[in-house]
Amino acid sequence: MVLHDFWTFFIWSTVAGLAVIGIYQLFLLILRARGVFVTRTKFGLTMIFDSEDADSTPIRLLNVNGTFQSVSYIAPELRFELCVHYHRMMAKVIQQVAPEGHVVVMGGGGFSLPKHLATHMSGGVIDAIEIDPKIVSLAREHFFLDEALAVASSNLRIIEDDAWKVLQNADAGSIDVLVNEVFAGRKSLGPLGTAAGAQVVKEKLVPEGVYLADVRCPLEGRGSALLSQVADVFAHEFAHVAYVPEWPDTPKTPGNNLLIATDADIALPEGAVVVK
């Protein structure tokens, strides 16, 4: 009786497993038939597909494990321009404070911001850190990274490593602008959302350096405490802290909120909320 039950369980488990595999393979076939490139990377199922923005301009998107990580224009004349508003704000701040400086971007994805900086700044050094070599390969194949490297007017260095480890090992006072996109999306800011992380950021920046971070959360409701918590942490280390909400008129909508922390007196983007 026990043996019979075992084989019954084994057979039905096998059938169920094969059914799941079959459904998954069918799902992949449907996506590929619709022009979606599907693969697996370090952090899960990864999809690349083309679409259009609100102005009907063709764009390409990178989605990793259900979270959009990057977006790029497809047209050759637009490939190194920025699609999203918070990236454009970041670029303006960087051009303001360090047009020929050392910029470190934590998190690669499709390398939208590093590509833009490398092709719009002259004489600067941009370090773009991505932990997953496969994501770097996808950026080269689908997001025009090699094209940007070929025409860059600044030194764009691609570093395949853990961004937090690279930051910890950086020389003190060696970075003009530090951009944190590593923990954007559904994850918290990890070590960089703590007091110890803020201290490391302060140590690695030049005296009037700037820290920029994408803090994805709503302004009100569930999950909204993240933004104020991170702002408070950095307010203990920097003279000036502000954030620019993506969706100020719909505060319960999760958005890419731009956090700015610095000891310098800089011109803040329009719509900035001053914390300190």
Task: List each model region and its residues.
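N-terminal Lys/Arg-rich, disordered targeting/topogenic segments
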Residues: M1-L3
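Non-catalytic surface loops within mature trypsin-like serine protease
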Residues: G66, P133, C217, D263-D265
